[in-house]
Amino acid sequence: MAKIILRHLIEIPVRYQEEFEARGLEDCRLDHALYALPGPTIVDLRKTRAAQSPPVDSAAETPPREGKSHFQILLDVVQFLPEDIIIQTFEGWLLIKAQHGTRMDEHGFISRSFTRQYKLPDGVEIKDLSAVLCHDGILVVEVKDPVGTK
């Protein structure tokens, strides 16, 4: 029986197709910044990537705006229904869990689950936390700046 290797879309994300044209595919294979969703440390990743190669689109890098959230997490949860996702806080930690039962996909049956933990900034209260599930399957969890601070 012949050995078959299935390549998933994560190896070649469509959102970075222009960058693949500017750089060789092998150069991008180990560039972990390509696989990160924007989050608290994405600014550092973008600076590192910009130093390594010329920017493809300068409009993609926007400075943080005054008065907006200072802590934001974006998760791709397109495979989960809103009722499959649990968001909790416990002793200064944000826990995001999701799990769905067995489903049929193009390759057979699959069940998915994940747990992510993030350390919340000091002084953050539960009432300052907001979560939105966007229509494209991105979960946005953010903590708004307290009034009077920058």
Curated annotation (Swiss-Prot):
One of its GO terms (cellular component) is nucleus. It is found in: Cytoplasm; Nucleus. Coiled coil: none annotated. It holds the Pfam family HSP20. InterPro entries: A-crystallin/Hsp20_dom (IPR002068), Alpha-crystallin/sHSP_animal (IPR001436), HSP20-like_chaperone (IPR008978), HSPB3 (IPR033894). Its main location: cytoplasm. Gene3D superfamilies: 2.60.40.790. Transmembrane segments: none annotated. Keywords: Cytoplasm, Disease variant, Neurodegeneration, Neuropathy, Nucleus, Stress response. It comes from the Eukaryota. One of its GO terms (biological process) is response to unfolded protein. Residues 47-150 form the sHSP domain. Inhibitor of actin polymerization. It is linked to Neuronopathy, distal hereditary motor, autosomal dominant 4: A form of distal hereditary motor neuronopathy, a heterogeneous group of neuromuscular disorders caused by selective degeneration of motor neurons in the anterior horn of the spinal cord, without sensory deficit in the posterior horn. The overall clinical picture consists of a classical distal muscular atrophy syndrome in the legs without clinical sensory loss. The disease starts with weakness and wasting of distal muscles of the anterior tibial and peroneal compartments of the legs. Belongs to the small heat shock protein (HSP20) family. PANTHER family: HEAT SHOCK PROTEIN BETA-3. This is Heat shock protein beta-3.
